Amino acid sequence: MGSKRKKAEKQKDFVKAKLRVGKTAAKPDNHTDTSFIAKSISIPNQTINKKTSNTEKKYEVDLAHHLSLTKHHSDVTRKEVLNYIEQHLPSNPSLYKDILTSIVPLIIDQSQNVRNALTSLLSACATQQVGLLDLHIRSIILFIHSAMSHIKPDIRNSSTKFLSVLIDHATESLVRSYFIKTLKSYFTLLSWTLTNDKKAVSLAITTSSSIGGPSKKARIHHLSILRAFLSAALFPISSNERKLDYSKIKMIHPESYKYLLASSTQPFASLKLFVQEVPKQKNTDIQQNTKKDDNAFSLNDLDTVSTEDIDTRRKVMLDVFMAPMLRNLKNLIKEGGEVGREAHSCMKVLEQLQSETK
């Protein structure tokens, strides 16, 4: 009896179970259940990573949504979005890169209300984050120069408002890197000529009549900003306005300041180490403006001249821009009124430069 029972028990291991419809197959005896879920233990006081709060995440999402609306087809929506961003500027400096990347193209927006709101927003951003416009001046000045030569008269008339913001908040970066290009854009904006030949004068008159010259009110504002730009570029900063005076700092060596970090952004941009420029053809009409002095700059030299120091800016002004600017300012003074008054103030700046460089 015992042997039969043992044989029956051993035989059970080799018997194949019959499957029934609607019922799952029987699990083997050595089956291990792996359906459990491990629970994590969180200790907030001992965590290393600092998580952002829900309010910060919500604000970043809200800011990204409003920045996307800067490309809305309605000018009213674009203006309201700019006003909203100005009233809710973030305290996190890393968010300002996305803000400026989205709003700078609106410098050439078709709506005047949008451009006015953008001027206020740029000033607010520069006040909130000191040095912000210096970091993004390359893209900002690109759109400003484009606005100064735009085909739309309204965009040209409001272009110097943005230049005024740069003069107030990014003076050194503006005059050091973009002095020549800004003056050239000013000549285009005011329909002035750099040369006195008949071909250039007739071309300027034709261009001004076809695209429409600046209005009287706009010319007053343009000349006012031009005076501020020339004063900032051609005269040294006073000791009260200077951010850091190295002469009053005690150092190990009197020339230690030369080896410190530069106070300006991109101090070696003038060397053009990583820039490939296309060679330009010489223009015979421009060569007529070249002076007999070998050390004097000509219009052909302006593309390769670096205006990092004030002496170079003064020399460029005296050699190239002084004579045509005085000639055009005298014509504006003859008109009288507020335009003549602003032109006279610009001429005073140039006369002061001439008296100091004699």
Swiss-Prot record:
Keywords: Nucleus, Ribosome biogenesis, rRNA processing
Molecular function via GO: chromatin binding
Superkingdom as given in the UniProt entry: Eukaryota
Key word rRNA processing present: yes
InterPro entries linked to this entry: ARM-like (IPR011989), ARM-type_fold (IPR016024), Ipi1_N (IPR024679)
Keyword Nucleus included in the entry's annotation: yes
Disulfide pairings: none
Compartments, record wording: Nucleus
Record note on quaternary structure: Component of the RIX1 complex, composed of IPI1, RIX1/IPI2 and IPI3 in a 1:2:2 stoichiometry. The complex interacts (via RIX1) with MDN1 (via its hexameric AAA ATPase ring) and the pre-60S ribosome particles.
Protein purpose: Component of the RIX1 complex required for processing of ITS2 sequences from 35S pre-rRNA.
Entry protein name: Pre-rRNA-processing protein IPI1
Natural source organism: Debaryomyces hansenii (strain ATCC 36239 / CBS 767 / BCRC 21394 / JCM 1990 / NBRC 0083 / IGC 2968) (Yeast)
